[in-house]
């Protein structure tokens, strides 16, 4: 999709605060500092619309980005950040679970995993959770510009084996630096949201 119009509409922690205009929604989840904001910025062709940070745990609410008045990207709180209190982690978990299990507008989940490493227990738990609730998943391996392209297939195999990856889902290697994988991500989003591509 060629993006000209995007708006960060709201931050929410409860269903009563979600948008009410019935547009399809794509959630983005991942470990703190995995690159969710960088992916969003690349998808919408902005350098810093979604604020990136070297400080993990910055996203603490569900952030709704309306794109071309056709869909929402929903940036959910990152998980696995040790310096966030146990109580705060539990709160984040409740916010995410309530959204993913009860939101009728949700069309799919983009699960971001650091492509340089094996998935963490939290990464695996998120994937298993999504599959249990029959949420379509696109697994995006991020930071792939840190790895030589000759090793991408090996890393993909490692990640898929750790997740017990379901072939019905989609997997893509992504680089925020080069944009590799961007078009594949958009194709999946357009398919899930039943909107026409204008790349």
From Swiss-Prot:
Cofactor: Mg(2+)
Domain of life: Bacteria
Gene Ontology annotations for the cellular component aspect, listed alphabetically: cytosol
Sites where the protein binds Mg(2+): 37, 59
Example GO BP: division septum assembly
Residues that, per the record, bind GTP: 30-37, 57-61, 75-78, 142-145, 174-176
Signal sequence bounds: none
Family: Belongs to the TRAFAC class TrmE-Era-EngA-EngB-Septin-like GTPase superfamily. EngB GTPase family.
Protein name: Probable GTP-binding protein EngB
Organism listed in the record: Latilactobacillus sakei subsp. sakei (strain 23K) (Lactobacillus sakei subsp. sakei)
């Amino acid at each position: 999709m060629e993006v000209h119009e995007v708006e960060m509409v709201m931050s929410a922690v409860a269903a009563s605060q979600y948008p009410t205009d019935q547009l399809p929604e794509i959630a983005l989840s991942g470990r703190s500092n995995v690159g969710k904001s960088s992916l969003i910025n690349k998808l919408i062709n902005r350098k810093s619309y979604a604020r990136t940070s070297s400080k993990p745990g910055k996203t603490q609410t569900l952030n709704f980005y309306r794109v071309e008045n056709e869909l929402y990207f929903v940036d959910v709180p990152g998980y696995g950040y040790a310096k966030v209190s146990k109580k705060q982690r539990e709160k984040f978990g409740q916010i995410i679970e309530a959204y993913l299990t009860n939101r009728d507008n949700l069309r799919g989940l983009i699960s971001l995993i650091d492509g340089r490493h094996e998935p963490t227990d939290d990464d695996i738990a998120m994937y298993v959770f999504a599959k249990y609730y029959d949420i379509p998943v696109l697994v995006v391996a991020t930071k792939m510009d840190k790895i030589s392209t000759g090793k991408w297939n090996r890393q993909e195999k490692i990640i898929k084996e750790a997740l017990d990856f379901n072939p019905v889902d989609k997997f893509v290697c992504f680089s925020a630096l080069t944009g590799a994988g961007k078009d594949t991500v958009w194709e999946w989003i357009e398919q899930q949201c039943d909107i026409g591509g204008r790349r």
